[in-house]
Design a protein with these regions (language model features):
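N-terminal Sec-pathway targeting helices
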Residues: 1-12
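Solvent-exposed, charged interface segments at domain starts and junctions
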Residues: 4, 15-16, 134
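Serine/threonine-biased, Pro/acidic-interspersed low-complexity stretches characteristic
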Residues: 4, 21-28
Length: 174
C-alpha cells in the first residue's frame, strides 16, 4: 500500500493569501508550491521580501535580489500589485502570484486528514472553499496537489500553518 505525507498550509493575512505546501522527500522536509497572491485595496508598488530558514530551489518570477543570510536565504521582488491580484514587475511582465519552493526545517504535523486517492479532488474542493480561496486560487492549488495525492492509495494532508510560519516569513514595504 502506497502512503504519503503531505502537509498543506494555508495562511490568509488581511487581503493576502499564501499557500505553502510541503512533503517529505527522502526524509527531508521540502516546501512545495508555496504561492503568494496579493490583493491590495488599491494599486500599490511593493517590495516583497521572503526570509527563509533554508535554501531556495525554484523561484518564479526571478527575484530582484537574492542572498544567503545567517538564517538561510532572503529573496525580494519589486512589484506593482493590483486589486484583482495581478502583479507587474519592473520590466512590465505580469504574473498571478509569486512562487518559490525550498528545502527547509519543518516538523511533522500533529493533525490532519487521511485522504483516499479517489477522494482527492472533492476533498480539496471542500476544504479550500471552507478556507475562503477563490476559484482561481483553488484551481491552481488543486491542479498541483490532486495528482500528488492521487499518486498514493492514501495520503495524510494537513492545513496546519504553524508547521512553517517560523521557517518562512514575508515582509512588505512600499
Amino acid at each position: 500500500m502506497k502512503k504519503a505525507l503531505i502537509v498543506i498550509g494555508v495562511v490568509v493575512v488581511a487581503a493576502l493569501a499564501c499557500f505553502v505546501a510541503c512533503n517529505m522527500v527522502n526524509n527531508e522536509p521540502v516546501a512545495k508550491k508555496p504561492v503568494l497572491y496579493l490583493y491590495p485595496q488599491e494599486e500599490r508598488h511593493l517590495t516583497v521580501t521572503l526570509d527563509l530558514e533554508g535554501s531556495l530551489d525554484t523561484v518564479y518570477p526571478a527575484p530582484d535580489s537574492q542572498q544567503a543570510t545567517e538564517r538561510g536565504t532572503q529573496a525580494s521582488w519589486m512589484v506593482t500589485a493590483a486589486p484583482d491580484g495581478t502583479l507587474t514587475d519592473r520590466a512590465g511582465r505580469t504574473y498571478p502570484s509569486l512562487f518559490w519552493d525550498a528545502y527547509m526545517p519543518l516538523p511533522e504535523p500533529d493533525s490532519g486528514f487521511v485522504v483516499a486517492r479517489e477522494d482527492a479532488v472533492s476533498f480539496l474542493e471542500g476544504k479550500l472553499a471552507q478556507l475562503g480561496l477563490n476559484d482561481r486560487e483553488a484551481a491552481d492549488f488543486i491542479t498541483y496537489w490532486a495528482p500528488r495525492i492521487r499518486a498514493h492509495e492514501y495520503t495524510f494532508v494537513s492545513f496546519d500553518a504553524s508547521a512553517y510560519t517560523q521557517a518562512a516569513s514575508y515582509h512588505f514595504t512600499d
